[in-house]
Amino acid sequence: VYIQSYKQYVDDLKCFMDKIVTRRSTSDNYILFAHSMGGAIGAMFLEMYPQYFKRAVLSSPLMKMKFKNLPYGIIYVVIKLAVLFGLEKEYAPGQYAFDGINIFEKSSSMSRKRYNYMFEARKCHRSFQTYGGTYAWTKASVMATRYIIRHAKNVKIPVLLCQAGCDSLVDSKGQNIFSKKSQNTTLKRFTYSKHEIFNATGSI
């Protein structure tokens, strides 16, 4: 995945809302549902354009990246240097292209049926095969999460933030800070869920 700024994603969403949704809808009672990276894009959109949605559900939103046990500051310096030296379109460490291998056991899903459904769709459609992040995407993601926390107070609509207790991709600290800084956010923690809450077990 390559992007220079999450503003590009936000602009795309605004274009979609303006040219498709609002023109074809018979109601203006829009509810936003967004997951993970989409949750970051959704949060930024709510901060920049608060007039579009009446309420929102953010599922495991990316509001702080998780870099295992490595210091956040050092990681960011390495990423900036990689971009500076022209490696922005190279995969960041640990990232790779879609290889068509089923890795349910290592995935962020807890439902094999739901995982397999998405996996087969991804295998069949090349446009679904976005996978590993580049250095540029990682840098853009860090910048986006900082922006989201800084402007959280601009989100005034009711937001349900669903937090996964066993998330290996997203650091929940960012979600906690956002929930406190935004004006009307309810945080619901799913203690035993992995990152993809909607792909968890039926009991969750």
List each language-model region with its residue ranges.
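Alpha/beta-hydrolase fold nucleophile elbow
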Residues: 24-36
